[in-house]
Structure formats: C-alpha cells, structure tokens
C-alpha cells in the first residue's frame, strides 16, 4: 500500500457515517506582488461566537488545489472536529521550469513561509481563529513545507503532519522551534522519491532518515526517545514518542513496503 493511498484511506475511514460537507470557498490575496490562490472550507457549525482551529493542507510538488482536494477531501473531518480547513496553492518556481513548488530549487530564493503567516492573518481578520490551534499537514513536498512551518513559523504553528517526506539535512542549522510541537508522520519504507532512510547523493546529505527525523522532534518535544510500537495492520506499524512528562507527542505510521 502506498503512503498516498494510506492517507486517502485514513480520510475515508474518518469520514464514514458523516453526511457530505458543503462547498469550498475559492479566494485570492496579493502577496509579494503576486496574486496567490487558496481555497477554504468553513463548517456549518461555525457561527462567529466561538474561535475555531485552523488547518492547512498542502499539496505535493507541482500540484494544484483542485486535484489535492479530490485526493484529500477533509471537509467531513472538519465538520465533526469543528475546524476551518485551508488548501493554499504553491507558486511557480522559475528555477524548476515554473513548476508549482512550496520550496525553491537551487538557485531560487523565494520563501513562502511569510506568505502562510500573512494568510493566517488574512483569514483571522474574517473569522474567529483559535491562535493556539493552527496546524499544517501535507503530502511529499507539502509535507516538507509543513516541517518548514514548524521550524520557521513555530510561533503560529501548534502541530504538523507530514506524509511521504522526512526532514531536510542538518535540521539544527535551520530549525528553531520556540515551543514543543506535535508531529505526525506517515512514511513508506520503500518510497524511492523520499527514501525512508534518508537521501545522500555524491557525498552530500539532502534528507535525514525517518529515525533521525523522529529523534529530532522527540528530543525537542521533551519526549522519551524510545518509541512504543503497536501493530495497526500487517503493513502498518504505529510508533509513539509520548511517554515522558511534559512531552508534546511525536507519532509515526510506518507503512511496510509503502512507496
């Protein structure tokens, strides 16, 4: 089972017995001289009297909002958990043939972290948002960008989820979280695009391993560095680093043979 299929299955299971949700609201905002697109969903339970959590869901590299909403439609979950759901659109990356990327390829220099910060402020100007419960999740490059937000927009991001991606190399050089930050990963052991054991090419490390990724966050989050494992299915193992006092959880769904 691929990690992308597992994500779809998890969303499907969570949404069982839930009536179909209402539609998305498509919108734009000007940022850094560009018209940026995003699509969001407000549950019917929102009436403006109670602050709602905010969840960002980021598509993968060269993805588009509409396709990702079809693959990862979280509206039924937003209805039951009562949060506002946002799907932003990545910008064109001139260093990568104008593909749609959250992070620029070398020698590109754009930075979308401030854009997400501005988008949070824009949405919060129109809706009552619980500023202590703003979350990010994403698939592949979207998962990598979720780590980026946990590292560089940590004052606004409470927790993240990353599917099919480990962290970039040497996180201590760029990651400066200011509070314990919950982290959930869904990683396939046979993923050749984002290898489970990290990626080193030509003697240069580009991505650290799943083990190193979880160790980084378990240490930062004051968790026990030894995980507890239980079997979810013959192909999925669940690891949790959450037993120490004051720990902000770290959790992995490890897909055996997943790519």
Model regions and ranges:
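Active-site glycine-rich loops that stabilize anionic/oxyanionic intermediates
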Residues: 52, 59-64, 258
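Active-site machinery of serine-nucleophile hydrolases
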Residues: 62-122, 252
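A domain-start/cap signature at the N-terminus of enzymes
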Residues: 19-54, 67, 77-80, 84, ...
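Gly/Ser-rich "nucleophile elbow"/oxyanion-hole loop immediately N-terminal to the catalytic nucleophile
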Residues: 44-50, 98-141, 151-154
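Acidic catalytic loop of the alpha/beta-hydrolase fold
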Residues: 190-194, 259
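Bacterial Sec-dependent N-terminal signal peptides
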Residues: 1-23
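Short beta-strand/loop motif that positions the catalytic acidic residue
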Residues: 185-187
């Amino acid at each position: 089972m691929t990690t992308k299929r597992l994500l779809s299955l998890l969303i499907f299971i969570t949404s069982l017995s839930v009536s179909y949700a209402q539609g998305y609201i498509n919108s734009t905002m000007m940022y850094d001289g560009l018209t940026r697109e995003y699509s969001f969903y407000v549950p019917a339970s929102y009436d403006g009297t109670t602050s709602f959590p905010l969840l960002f869901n980021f598509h993968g590299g060269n993805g588009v909002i509409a396709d990702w909403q079809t693959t990862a439609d979280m509206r039924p979950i937003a209805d039951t958990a009562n949060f506002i759901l946002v799907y932003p659109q990545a910008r064109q990356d001139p260093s990568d043939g104008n593909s749609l990327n959250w992070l620029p390829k070398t020698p590109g220099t754009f930075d979308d972290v401030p854009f997400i910060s501005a988008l949070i402020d824009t949405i919060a100007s129109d809706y009552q948002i619980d500023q202590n419960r703003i979350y990010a999740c994403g698939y592949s490059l979207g998962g990598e960008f979720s780590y980026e937000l946990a590292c560089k927009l940590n004052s606004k991001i409470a927790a993240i989820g990353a599917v099919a991606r480990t962290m970039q190399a040497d996180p201590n050089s760029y990651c400066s979280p200011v509070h314990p930050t919950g982290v959930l990963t869904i990683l396939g052991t046979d993923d050749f695009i984002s290898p489970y054991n990290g990626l080193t090419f030509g003697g240069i490390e580009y991505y650290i391993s799943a083990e190193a990724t979880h160790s980084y966050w378990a240490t930062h989050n004051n968790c026990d560095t030894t995980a507890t494992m239980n079997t979810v299915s013959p192909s999925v193992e669940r690891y949790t680093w959450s037993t120490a006092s004051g720990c902000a959880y770290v959790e992995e769904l490890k897909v055996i043979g997943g790519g």
